Amino acid sequence: MLGSVKMEAHDLAEWSYYPEAGEVYSPVNPVPTMAPLNSYMSLNPLSSPYPPGGLQASPLPTGPLAPPAPTAPLGPTFPGLGAGSGTGGSASGYGAPGPGLVHGKEMAKGYRRPLTHAKPPYSYISLITMAIQQAPGKMLTLSEIYQWIMDLFPYYRENQQRWQNSIRHSLSFNDCFVKVARSPDKPGKGSYWALHPSSGNMFENGCYLRRQKRFKLEEKAKKGNSATSATRNGTVGSATSATTTAATAVTSPAQPQPTPPSEPEAQSGEDVGGLDCASPPSSAPYFTGLELPGELKLDAPYNFNHPFSINNLMSEQTSTPSKLDVGFGGYGAESGEPGVYYQSLYSRSLLNAS
């Protein structure tokens, strides 16, 4: 009995490690504290994946906890947000935009000009024509045209200098407008402007939005065409005459120019200093009736005037130093010594025969 009791005591010691299911209690872990949030995280509580109350460390159900104390906003908020924007607030915590933002949106829209001040869809020629046709005398001065346009269209009350220059340009460079001088009974400044009688109906059925055709005076057009054709004809005629002159100059042979008469060689010799510059007499007068042996027959005519011929070089040795030829350095002898001349001639002939 006692042993069994002892065994039960040992068994109780071993079975104490396995408690019953009803006696098991899950431990309650304390809620961990979060680090202080910065100002950026406090502004947007919806972006956080965790509930605003904190994190639960244990997945098991826990006992009832005390309700959390209300927390104050941890960081500053934007000035444009409402007072309800806090850490525990919802998306509706962002306040409505202030009146300054609404006013800025209204100013962002483009300023739209009223219809009465819009630019009229008429050209300057149309405006001038309307003003002149509605005048009692069918003519107006330049200042009256300006005033009529500004009274009818408020758009032209601004930037007057720009469109008034265009009006003057249209009056001056269009043939449909004619300048009329003032009559003595209507004194004043400036001439009148009227429509040309032949301009007719320039616009389609009185609609001034588009002109039917541009009016031009036929006289000016004819003068312009004639001047253009005359200019073209003159240009073509001058080009043709220049071509003819060039062709004549090419086809006509070049005429020899007259050479001035040369002065006698004796005078040039006297100017040089008394030297004998007379050309040697030709060999034809001396040998017309002379019969020479076969070995002494004359060769074909030879140019004795060549400065480097053998005849000139040999004659330089026989001639005296004071009687040199000016042209070729001592050719031949004086006219009074024919022997020396024939001696040089025969020596040349013998050299050629050999």
Swiss-Prot record:
Residues 52-92, 219-280 are annotated as: Disordered. GO terms for cellular component: nucleus. CDD domains: FH_FOXA3. Residues 81-92 have a biased composition (Gly residues). This is Hepatocyte nuclear factor 3-gamma. GO terms for biological process: anatomical structure morphogenesis; cell differentiation; cellular response to starvation; chromatin organization; hematopoietic stem cell homeostasis; intracellular glucose homeostasis; negative regulation of cell population proliferation; positive regulation of hepatocyte differentiation. Interacts with FOXA2. InterPro entries: FH_FOXA3, Fork-head_N, Fork_head_dom, FOX_domain-containing, TF_fork_head_CS_1, TF_fork_head_CS_2, WH-like_DNA-bd_sf, WH_DNA-bd_sf. It is found in: Nucleus. Residues 225-237 have a biased composition (Polar residues). The keyword ATP-binding does not apply. Residues 238-254 have a biased composition (Low complexity). Liver. Keywords: Activator, Chromatin regulator, Developmental protein, Differentiation, DNA-binding, Nucleus, Transcription, Transcription regulation. SMART domains: FH. GO terms for molecular function: DNA binding; DNA-binding transcription factor activity; DNA-binding transcription factor activity, RNA polymerase II-specific; protein domain specific binding; RNA polymerase II cis-regulatory region sequence-specific DNA binding; sequence-specific DNA binding; sequence-specific double-stranded DNA binding; transcription cis-regulatory region binding. Residues 118-209 bind DNA. Residues 61-73 have a biased composition (Pro residues). Transcription factor that is thought to act as a 'pioneer' factor opening the compacted chromatin for other proteins through interactions with nucleosomal core histones and thereby replacing linker histones at target enhancer and/or promoter sites. Originally described as a transcription activator for a number of liver genes such as AFP, albumin, tyrosine aminotransferase, PEPCK, etc. Interacts with the cis-acting regulatory regions of these genes. Involved in glucose homeostasis. Involved in regulation of neuronal-specific transcription. May be involved in regulation of spermatogenesis.
